[in-house]
Amino acid sequence: MKNQTPCRVSKITTITQNKRVRYEYFIEQEFEAGISLLGWEVKSLRAGIVHINDSYILLKDSEAFLLGATLRPLIVASSHILYSPMRSRKLLLRRRELDTLLGKVHRKGYTIVPISLYWRNSLAKIQLGIAKGKKQYDKRHCIKEREWLLNKARITKLVHR
């Protein structure tokens, strides 16, 4: 019998989600990227004081950067560190993923949006989506579907009592 090594199970803990992005955009494809962070930023992520609602991804010189994300620093006694909560943070992607993102954004008119921020085995990761903006009637249709699902759940709950 062969020695079988147990496969590693990755533990995922969500830090924050951008709930508005599913309402505003059609998500075509999703990617996972690492984030280059400073020490105080990691502590802020662990405390959960981060907002990615108004953030976006900028592709520059074949690199991806997260702009507009707010990581508030913890209140600590250290005064020698200059905190910049709105600084741009480099995203760590493979070359093939970057080429895919660049091609979709430049040729087809897509945009790249952050969907969620989470821990995967003690590494901070961000889920990116290649997205196309929704029109107003698409948003209304989405609201109608969501309300219908809620009403349907209420009706079936009442029937099965």
UniProtKB/Swiss-Prot annotation:
Gene3D superfamilies: 2.40.280.10. One of its GO terms (cellular component) is cytosol. Pfam families: SmpB. InterPro entries: SmpB, SsrA-bd_prot, SsrA-bd_prot_CS. PROSITE patterns: SSRP (PS01317). Required for rescue of stalled ribosomes mediated by trans-translation. Binds to transfer-messenger RNA (tmRNA), required for stable association of tmRNA with ribosomes. tmRNA and SmpB together mimic tRNA shape, replacing the anticodon stem-loop with SmpB. tmRNA is encoded by the ssrA gene; the 2 termini fold to resemble tRNA(Ala) and it encodes a 'tag peptide', a short internal open reading frame. During trans-translation Ala-aminoacylated tmRNA acts like a tRNA, entering the A-site of stalled ribosomes, displacing the stalled mRNA. One of its GO terms (biological process) is trans-translation. This is SsrA-binding protein.
